[in-house]
Amino acid sequence: MARIGVENSLTDVQQALKQQGHEVVTLNSEQDAQGCDCCVVTGQDSNMMGIADASIKGSVITAHGLTTDDICQQVESRT
């Protein structure tokens, strides 16, 4: 399964992705995003920790307005 970086405050998303078998990394700094296939951020800060500046090779999913299921579906489609 994929290695997914998830912003610290999105604990429900972290748990759901772990249940699906993904390796979940908590994003506390820009370095945490390195090596991730995809990152999920709250969207409260559109450039959270510089992740939007191509710090990762994968997709960045903004969780704002999405349910946990929506986010999990986006992760599946992008990894």
Curated annotation (Swiss-Prot):
InterPro entries: UPF0180. Signal peptide: none annotated. Pfam families: UPF0180. Belongs to the UPF0180 family. This is UPF0180 protein BCAH820_1484. The lineage of its organism: Bacteria, Bacillati, Bacillota, Bacilli, Bacillales.
